[in-house]
C-alpha cells in the first residue's frame, strides 16, 4: 500500500470515527440538584437541571409523577400526547402530568436549559423511554 493510500484510509477512518462520536453525544442531559421526601407517602421530589443541545431531541418518554419545568435559557418545541406541539421559551413554564408521553426538540442555536421539578413515585426511574403517540 502506498504512503498516499495509507493516509487516505487513515483519514477516512478518523472522519468516520468523529461522526460516530458526535452521533453518540447525548441530546438531553439531566443533572440532579436535590432529592427529598414530600408529604405524600411513597413520593419524593427531584429537582434537576435539564439541557437539550441545539438541534437535539429529548426522545419520547414518561415520568412516574408530575413534571413542573421552567425554561431558563433557549427555546424548545414541546410535544405532549393529545396536544398540539407548542414552543416554550426562556421565562415560561409548563406542567406534564404523570405517565403522559412527551418529547422536546431544540430548534434553536443555543442549548435549551431548564429546571425540572418532578414529584414521583419513590424508587422508580425518573424517566422511561416510550413510543411516540399515534397522530
Where do the model's predicted regions map?
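A short glycine-rich, His/Asp/Glu-containing loop-to-beta-strand
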Residues: 26-60
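Extracytoplasmic
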Residues: 42-47, 63-66, 83, 99, ...
Amino acid at each position: 500500500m502506498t504512503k498516499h493510500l495509507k493516509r487516505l484510509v487513515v483519514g477516512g477512518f478518523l472522519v468516520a470515527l468523529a461522526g460516530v462520536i458526535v452521533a453518540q453525544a447525548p441530546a438531553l442531559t439531566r443533572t440532579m440538584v436535590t432529592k427529598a421526601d414530600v408529604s405524600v407517602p411513597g413520593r419524593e421530589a427531584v429537582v434537576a437541571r435539564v439541557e437539550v443541545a441545539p438541534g437535539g431531541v429529548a426522545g419520547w418518554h414518561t415520568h412516574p409523577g408530575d413534571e413542573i419545568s421552567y425554561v431558563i435559557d433557549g427555546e424548545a418545541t414541546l410535544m405532549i400526547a393529545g396536544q398540539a406541539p407548542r414552543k416554550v421559551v426562556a421565562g415560561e413554564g409548563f406542567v406534564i402530568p404523570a405517565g403522559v408521553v412527551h418529547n422536546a426538540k431544540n430548534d434553536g442555536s443555543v442549548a435549551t436549559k431548564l429546571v425540572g421539578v418532578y414529584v414521583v413515585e419513590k424508587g422508580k426511574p425518573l424517566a422511561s423511554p416510550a413510543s411516540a403517540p399515534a397522530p
